[in-house]
């Protein structure tokens, strides 16, 4: 979209979404791109769309999480080994941590009967680094892992309708 802000910002708290945007090329054919919908109101007075390269998320020590024994079910291996630490941006909002979600609310699914697969990958990091995105199981159920950079079968987030979701974003320590 032409209304994307490109001035570099660092966001360290508040709500934002990785958002799929839909436009059209010169022939009217739909085109899609990713942007950050910044609702933090820390670098602007209102919600704004930002280009991905212009946004840095600051993850501070208060996001450090050690996997407890109570989450020893293998479904939670996305957090690393029991007793291991990682940085987690949680599924539920914590006002002291950046709270990223995922949104396809700007996509018209009428011409997409099979839905949309959004590929996700870890671009860079130290040796052995990983990133993941999962939603906690409800009522004691197993978590749903949407993305795990260590598992090629978990490299896309699939949606079949307009979606706004939050999950746990995990980054190795």
Across the structure, where does each feature detected by a protein language model lie?
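Phosphate/adenylate-binding glycine loop and adjacent helical scaffold
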Residues: 1-152, 156, 160-163
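Hydrophobic/aromatic beta-strand elements that line small-molecule binding cavities or substrate pockets
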Residues: 169
């Amino acid at each position: 979209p032409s209304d994307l802000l490109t001035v570099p910002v660092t966001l360290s708290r508040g709500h934002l979404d990785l958002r799929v945007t839909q436009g059209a090329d010169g022939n009217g054919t739909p085109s899609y791109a990713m942007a950050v919908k910044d609702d933090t109101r820390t670098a602007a007075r209102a919600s704004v769309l930002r280009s991905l390269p212009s946004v840095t998320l600051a993850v501070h020590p208060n996001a450090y999480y050690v996997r407890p024994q109570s989450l020893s079910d293998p479904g939670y291996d996305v957090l690393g080994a029991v007793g291991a630490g990682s940085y987690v941006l949680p599924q539920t909002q914590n006002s002291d941590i950046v709270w990223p979600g995922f949104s396809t609310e700007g996509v018209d699914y009428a011409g997409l009967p099979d839905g949309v697969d959004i590929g996700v990958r870890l671009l860079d990091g130290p040796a052995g680094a990983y990133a993941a995105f999962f939603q906690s199981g409800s009522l004691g159920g197993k978590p749903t892992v949407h993305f795990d950079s260590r598992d090629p079968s978990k490299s896309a987030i699939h949606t079949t309708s307009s979606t706004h979701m939050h999950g746990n974003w995990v980054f190795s320590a």
